[in-house]
C-alpha cells in the first residue's frame, strides 16, 4: 500500500538574500499559521455554498413536485404535505442564514489569501517591516473574529491529514 504524500505549502521559487535567518523562519511560521486559516475558511466557504445550494434545490423540487402531483391528482393533502416540506426546507435555509455565512467565509479566506501573497512577496525581497505588518494582521484577525465568521473546527482534521502528517 502506498503512503499518501502530504502537500508542501512552502512553494517559493526565490528567497531574498537581504533577509536574515530569523526573518526567514518568522515569515515561514507566519505563512504556516495563515495558510491554515486561509484553507479552513475556504473549506468553510465551500461547505456553506453546497449546503445553501442543496437546500434551495431541494425546496424547489419539493414545492414543484407537490404542486404538480397535487394538481394532477386533485388531492390537496399531497399538495399541502409535499409543498409544505419544501417550504420547511426553505425556511430552514433562511434560519441557518447561509448567505451571511457564505459572505463572511469568503471575506475571511480572501483576506487571508492576501496575507499569504504579502508573505510570499516579503520572502522574495519586498521591504518587510515586522511591527507594522504584525499590527496589520492582528487588526485583520480581530476584524474577522468581530464580524462573526463561522467556525472552521470541522475541517481542521482534514487540513492536518493533507498538509501536516
Locate each region found by the language model.
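Conserved non-transmembrane functional hotspots
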Residues: 2-61, 91-165
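Membrane-active amphipathic alpha-helices enriched in small hydrophobic residues
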Residues: 54-68, 81-88
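Amphipathic alpha-helical interface surfaces
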Residues: 77-80, 84, 88, 108, ...
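Membrane-interfacial hairpin junctions
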Residues: 68-78
Amino acid at each position: 500500500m502506498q503512503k499518501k504524500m502530504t502537500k508542501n505549502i512552502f512553494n517559493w521559487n526565490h528567497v531574498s538574500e537581504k533577509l536574515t535567518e530569523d526573518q526567514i523562519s518568522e515569515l515561514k511560521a507566519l505563512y504556516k499559521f495563515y495558510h491554515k486559516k486561509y484553507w479552513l475558511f475556504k473549506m468553510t466557504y465551500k461547505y456553506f455554498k453546497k449546503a445553501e445550494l442543496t437546500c434551495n434545490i431541494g425546496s424547489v423540487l419539493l414545492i414543484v413536485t407537490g404542486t404538480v402531483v397535487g394538481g394532477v391528482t386533485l388531492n390537496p393533502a399531497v399538495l399541502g404535505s409535499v409543498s409544505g416540506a419544501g417550504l420547511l426546507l426553505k425556511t430552514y435555509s433562511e434560519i441557518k442564514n447561509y448567505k451571511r455565512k457564505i459572505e463572511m467565509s469568503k471575506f475571511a479566506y480572501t483576506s487571508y489569501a492576501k496575507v499569504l501573497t504579502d508573505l510570499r512577496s516579503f520572502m522574495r525581497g519586498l521591504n518587510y517591516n515586522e511591527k507594522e505588518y504584525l499590527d496589520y494582521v492582528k487588526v485583520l484577525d480581530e476584524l474577522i473574529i468581530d464580524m462573526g465568521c463561522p467556525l472552521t473546527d470541522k475541517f481542521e482534521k482534514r487540513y492536518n491529514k493533507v498538509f501536516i502528517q
